[in-house]
Amino acid sequence: MKSVRYLIGLFAFIACYYLLPISTRLLWQPDETRYAEISREMLASGDWIVPHLLGLRYFEKPIAGYWINSIGQWLFGANNFGVRAGVIFATLLTAALVTWFTLRLWRDKRLALLATVIYLSLFIVYAIGTYAVLDPFITFWLVAGMCSFWLAMQAQTWKGKSAGFLLLGITCGMGVMTKGFLALAVPVLSVLPWVATQKRWKDLFIYGWLAVISCVLTVLPWGLAIAQREPDFWHYFFWVEHIQRFALDDAQHRAPFWYYLPVVIAGSLPWLGLLPGALYAGWKNRKHSATVYLLSWTIMPLLFFSVAKGKLPTYILSCFAPLAMLMAHYALLAAKNNPLALRINGWINIAFGVTGIIATFVVSPWGPMNTPVWQTFESYKVFCAWSIFSLWAFFGWYTLTNVEKTWPFAALCPLGLALLVGFSIPDRVMEGKHPQFFVEMTQESLQPSRYILTDSVGVAAGLAWSLQRDDIIMYRQTGELKYGLNYPDAKGRFVSGDEFANWLNQHRQEGIITLVLSVDRDEDINSLAIPPADVIDRQERLVLIQYRPK
């Protein structure tokens, strides 16, 4: 009976965090709008080999993540939930692997359930796991690889070992097809310390080639298909998206070595109090095979991405699955022997909630700021933000009432965030970061437009997805579409600032021409170097400028 209650509680937890509130949040640009539009175009065109964005070749990532996103929109429709359905599914599958692997290592159902809840409630997991990017997919394949390698090395027969390594190769192959060759580097680096400490080199060398073969066979059909269709895909993807992005001096998203330290700290909420003890206990018990394996899968990817020049918070998402298992194991030991870490965790959550309440007041219309984040007419959004932090502090306090028994309720600290964050986003943020909001405000003007031009790829993708059209033209800036725009058949999909006046004269009689520009808050739109317009509609950071036939 207790097991049934636990299962009902887990399903209610998943529903409140990962299902019910998702549709209340508009899509963010540039990431969510980009991936939403790529998948929409895949469904509309029926081309499941070559990814396109705004009708242009888009070679920044392989195909598998787009497949899953497309299936999500096919099943649930072109809506906010449909766009995010794929990443939510991947996150829940990863949580299922956490459950299974914890049960496999310790044979403890309660520990497995706690590891799952800790994983799903970690701030970084929830933030990225409900956000339409490709990282939850690669995380699933990496965690699946972690489980597969363990199965292979623990098998007692050659058939079991062979099956485990073949499965490992499939997960690596799907990882390559999701986000590239990092899906090969991370597993290799993660298992080496364990193999070295356990002296299991023989098994690795005897059976490892099976993983290589199954990985190649997994990638080969699509790899050959896209090479035939687009011969320069692999050159661009390997050199630009891997070497330049991560290793060279001009790498994207350059950041210092210590960049991930604050990411790990913030991402570990509401379980931050368990982080030091979990890592220390893992190191202290490094003679235990399972513990050192989890520790290696936590630390090695973190070090690898810290050394790389290009960094983003999403890159280290896979580290938190083994970390959640270490945290759960440590928490149960602490609850029995010394609950100090659990008390510290409760106080951290109280402090975070109270700090958030104070910060919300400071940036509210009633605070001391001359330019508040929320305006007076957005009072309900301020109260939603207060509720988010109040619930965080409340559940932090509740875990202290009987800490040996109530500490798991820290998982409910982000409940307010899950339910209310979509209602608390300030209008000034929505107007710049949520193209759907802009489309709602300007729908009547946008819909009849013969041509739509914009200077932002993220906004262009949002307009294309909302209006169900892929012919948005880039104006002044090419951004990440630069490579696709270089193809001969992309001629006419970019208009420079100097060419716009002539282009306008040539096309004005064909129908309404709409220009959507991103501007600074204090920028005078009358100073823009464009011909006089018939309509100007400013929505804070986005401006609609329209030219009608004459």
Curated annotation (Swiss-Prot):
Annotated protein name in UniProt: Undecaprenyl phosphate-alpha-4-amino-4-deoxy-L-arabinose arabinosyl transferase
HAMAP family tied to this protein: ArnT_transfer
Biological source species: Escherichia coli O81 (strain ED1a)
EC number: 2.4.2.43
TM ranges: 7-27, 81-101, 113-133, 134-154, 165-185, 204-224, 263-283, 288-308, 315-335, 346-366, 382-402, 406-426
InterPro entries on file: ArnT_tfrase, Glyco_trans_39/83, LipidA_mod_glycosyltrf_83
GO biological process terms held by the UniProt record: lipid A biosynthetic process; lipopolysaccharide biosynthetic process; protein O-linked glycosylation; response to iron(III) ion
Pathway: Lipopolysaccharide metabolism; 4-amino-4-deoxy-beta-L-arabinose-lipid A biosynthesis
Mode of membrane association: Multi-pass membrane protein
Keyword Lipid biosynthesis recorded: yes
Family statement: Belongs to the glycosyltransferase 83 family.
